[in-house]
Amino acid sequence: MNDPILSVEQVSKSFCCATERIQILSDVSFSVPRAVKVAITGESGCGKSTLLNIIGGMEHADSGIVRVLSCDVLTLHEHALTEYRRQFLGLVFQFHHLLRDFTALENVMLPGLIAGKSYREVRARAYELLEKVRVVQRAHHFPAQMSGGERQRTAVARALINDPTLILADEPTGNLDPKNALIVQDLLFSLTEEYQKTLLIVTHDPRIASMTDYRYQLQQGSLIRI
């Protein structure tokens, strides 16, 4: 492996359930090098999304260390976490989370404008990405006017708008029919390769996992290389 872009060290997480605490993650450690695709698999409810959310600064861990390049994620306060996500991460979820009153183009542009980039630069980049994900013809359509596959491809374009270091994808094809799932998966993989991005994907689909460079399985709180 080359130098890691992501390093997770002894991360643990538990939740309170009625009268007991449920241990979801137990001393999870792994590292991810640059420009590779990594899959995390496991049964529903085993903690895959929790781990991804901790890496993304969207959930707290009970203990451990998460580093993305020089950024010590678990020590960051809220404002710094927002900057961390803006600077380092592209996020793709099972649900597209597009703003319904914004067009596809506006949805893709929004993170770039929030980051303070020029309107002209962001607009040109957004059109380029919509072309890449093959929905440029829907640039001025609202989410309700688009198919599920088109919405999710737009979400992939949005994740790339700020040229992120690391893309976190949580079951990005989980809500799609097989045909659209294959299209979204192929685009996500091809674009991360083209732009030399690191992809960490949570999936229950063994076919998708088999196409990544490194594969891990989460079992009873422990992460196992497979």
Swiss-Prot record:
InterPro entries: AAA+_ATPase, ABC_transporter-like_ATP-bd, MacB-like_ATP-bd, P-loop_NTPase. It is an enzyme of class 7 (translocase). GO terms for cellular component: plasma membrane. Its main location: membrane. ATP binds at residues 42-49. Its EC number is 7.6.2.-. GO terms for molecular function: ATP binding; ATP hydrolysis activity. It is a peripheral membrane protein. Keywords: ATP-binding, Cell inner membrane, Cell membrane, Membrane, Nucleotide-binding, Translocase, Transport. The complex is composed of two ATP-binding proteins (LolD) and two transmembrane proteins (LolC and LolE). This is Lipoprotein-releasing system ATP-binding protein LolD.
